[in-house]
Amino acid sequence: MKSRFLFVVLGYDCSKVAKDCDTKNERYFCLTTACVLRKIVLVVYFCWVGLDMSMFLKRAAIGAMALMLSSTTFAVGNERIDSFSDAKKKLENQVYTEAVNRVTIYCAAKYDQRKNVTRPKGFKLPLNRDGEPIHEKRAKRIEWEHIVPAENFGRAFIEWREGHPLCVEKGKSFKGRKCAEKVNRTFQYMQADMYNLYPAIGAVNALRSNYNFQLLDADTPSTFGSCEMKIVDKKVEPPVRARGVIARTYKYMDGAYPAYKMSRAQKQLMDTWDAQHPVDQWECTRAKRIEKIQGNENPIVKAQYQKAGLW
């Protein structure tokens, strides 16, 4: 009976309690409260079985320290750069400064300082009904892709959904991204967050749109020839090379901004991709540079490198 009770208490995952709390502050409170309650139950247990309380208290102190240093990480978002245009310029001039790192996220296409793309061998654009390549002009240059699409977090803002008294042009009111960008400071910060921006071939960025990432059937063909980016029925499966970066970006945005929240299925997929595809040196260097410019860290990336002693 006693051993079974101990097994249940020790097997309880405190972090699960925090998953349904809405904001990062609420998640921290939920997590801390749940784990403190677990420790109280353990005190009762040790009294019940008559173990040395002084030894238990020492172990409890160690456990509390481990909790503080646990892998449950809460990010703080961008509060310095409020212009999407400025964010793109800073990425181009202060982050992607070496030619070796000027490579697009999905198709590994190289590009120059003027954003001109060298398409990978075998890269193809899908064709329209007239047999012409779609977004041919945009395929020649890179664009800064929101990994978590602006629309997916923008819909949380009333200015996006309904407009605002200040969102009027030539006597006509407007809403959507243009309105949120004009009047909502939080949206401005989220849209300009450099951790969420990666270079992509313009045509790929256009066709990805605001569709969510997921796994498609194994026999689904690539949409772009040799670039293993698959887009079908408003669903997107990214190439293997991009999955770790995508996962850590989604997890960062989910932790940093209460306005954005992943679904349970998304969280499970991103946790899987994060574990399967660890960070590399460039992802670490990129995060360091952005932290210096933007003023906030990306703890999702940073925690992995600190664990490996590489930060």
Predicted segments, located by residue:
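N-terminal signal peptide c-region/cleavage motif recognized by signal peptidases
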Residues: S70-T73
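Polybasic, lysine-rich low-complexity intrinsically disordered segments
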Residues: K2-S3, K19, K24-N25, K39-I40
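Domain-level detector of nuclease and nuclease-like folds
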Residues: E132-W311
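Bacterial N-terminal signal peptides that target proteins for export
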Residues: S54-A64
